[in-house]
Amino acid sequence: MRVSYLSLTLTIVVVIAIIYAPETEAKAWADADAEAGLGFLAKIMGKVGMRMIKKLVPEAAKVAVDQLSQQQ
């Protein structure tokens, strides 16, 4: 079975990148966010929800007024 030169080249590049990769170290940020997980997601969804409500309510009110005026 013959190995293609492209896959052989990519394999060599990956191996060399792993061997010569610098050591990394995780550092804590001073301004780490205290909220994480579902609390953070709920906060973002609340902000997005309020923006949507502020944009949609006036439009919905216009449609409701138009439909009520057409019925009369």
Swiss-Prot record:
Compartments, as annotated in UniProt: Secreted
This protein's major location comes to secreted
Q: Name one GO molecular function term.
A: toxin activity
UniProt cross-references to InterPro entries, sorted A to Z: Pilosulin
Keywords in alphabetical order: Neurotoxin, Secreted, Signal, Toxin
Q: Does this UniProt record's set of keywords contain Nucleotide-binding?
A: no
Where is it expressed, tissue-wise? Expressed by the venom gland.
Instruction: Give the residue range of the signal peptide.
Output: 1-26
Source superkingdom:
Eukaryota
Task: Provide the propeptide boundaries.
Answer: 27-36
Q: How is this protein named in the record?
A: U10-myrmicitoxin-Tb1a
